[in-house]
């Protein structure tokens, strides 16, 4: 059942849909996280996986940065590997390491053993979405999932990887096994996002954290068709959809195609290595842009932050003049744990004043 709210005055939704917002909208990837003392207090009593499968904790953690910073959107607190865990894959999130898979997926038999995501396994996530949409007032809620390629990399490597050698070896050397794996993970991603959409999220963002390790040719051949299927499946909901990766300057056009083929409103996330104006010339016409302050800037003191924030806002305006449908201010990746929350709040206030 569609329980989506009407939020006609949301600056975030306006910019994401290509309409002129009343102000430049701003939110931050990883805005709910270790930079916040209230988050650290909750996490001291709960593991990451416990937090990701507890509706009350998901709700509270998601709300924390909205209360503190006054951002223009909340993003559902979760982790990229949550749908994998919900599908029965044995894994854990190890502090200071990241997701660790008990039995890496390396063969066709391993791929065949991946189970579909059963809706009841993510009921706490759906419940949290319903609680959040009731609590957020006029602030939109962004749903969250990892893209099939990034999920595949975690599964094949067994955890985080610098070179993704096992992943690329399967992709290039065993393409039938690779596409079977990507198809299974695309189904898992669709099911996880569909659960969030049905529960009432106002937008979604798909994180392809490791896509930047690929050439454009390999991305088009081995990844794009599967990512496009995710967006095509979610398009009937009509919510804005964002596609984000790190180090993806050469992939921005293809990543925007993944959404554009669905016909739904599309936003492409841009990291700090690429100017927004340059990105506007790379993405499909009609795409909005999101980004792209370097997260490290927030550690450099307020005078540096202020100059950089003003530069990003101006770059966003030039990008819109160059053809981008809109601009959502964000970082080029997640908020770093050492970031002073007061600097984040001041950044929101500054963006809103410009």
Curated annotation (Swiss-Prot):
Metabolic or biological pathway: Porphyrin-containing compound metabolism; protoporphyrin-IX biosynthesis; coproporphyrinogen-III from 5-aminolevulinate: step 4/4
EC number from the UniProt entry: 4.1.1.37
GO biological process: protoporphyrinogen IX biosynthetic process
Protein name: Uroporphyrinogen decarboxylase
NCBIfam families assigned: hemE
Annotated positions for site Transition state stabilizer: 79
GO cellular component: cytosol
Native source species: Mycobacterium sp. (strain KMS)
Family assignment from sequence similarity: Belongs to the uroporphyrinogen decarboxylase family.
Top enzyme category: lyase
């Amino acid at each position: 059942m569609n329980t989506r709210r009407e939020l006609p005055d949301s600056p975030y939704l306006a910019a994401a849909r290509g309409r002129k917002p009343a102000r430049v909208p701003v939110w931050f990837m990883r805005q709910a996280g270790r930079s916040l003392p209230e988050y650290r207090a909750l996490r001291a009593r709960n593991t990451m996986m416990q937090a990701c499968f507890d509706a009350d904790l998901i709700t509270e953690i998601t709300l924390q940065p909205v209360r503190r910073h006054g951002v223009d959107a909340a993003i559902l607190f979760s982790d990229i590997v949550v749908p994998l865990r919900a599908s029965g894959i044995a894994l854990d999130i190890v502090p200071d390491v990241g997701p660790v898979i008990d039995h890496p997926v390396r063969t066709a038999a391993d791929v065949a053993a991946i189970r579909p995501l059963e809706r009841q396994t993510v009921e706490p996530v759906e419940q949290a979405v319903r609680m959040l949409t009731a609590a957020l007032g006029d602030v939109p809620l962004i749903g969250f999932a990892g893209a099939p390629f990034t999920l595949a990399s975690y599964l094949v490597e067994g955890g985080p990887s610098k070179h993704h050698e096992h992943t690329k070896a399967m992709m290039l050397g065993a393409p039938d096994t690779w596409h079977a794996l990507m198809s299974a993970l695309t189904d898992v991603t669709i099911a996880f996002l569909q659960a969030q959409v049905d529960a009432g999220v106002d937008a979604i963002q798909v994180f392809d954290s490791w896509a930047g390790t690929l050439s454009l040719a390999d991305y088009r051949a081995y990844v794009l068709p599967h990512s496009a299927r995710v967006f095509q499946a979610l398009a009937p909901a009509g919510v804005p959809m964002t596609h984000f990766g790190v180090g993806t300057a050469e992939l921005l056009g293809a990543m925007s195609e993944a959404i554009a083929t669905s016909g739904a409103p599309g936003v492409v996330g841009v990291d700090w290595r690429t100017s927004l104006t340059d990105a506007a010339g790379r993405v499909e016409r009609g795409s909005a842009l999101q980004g792209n302050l370097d997260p490290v800037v927030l550690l450099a003191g307020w005078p540096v932050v202020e100059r950089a924030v003003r530069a990003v806002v101006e770059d966003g305006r030039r990008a819109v003049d160059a053809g981008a449908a809109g601009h959502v201010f964000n970082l080029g990746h997640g908020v770093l744990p050492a970031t002073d929350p007061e600097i984040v709040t001041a950044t929101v206030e500054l963006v809103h004043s410009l």
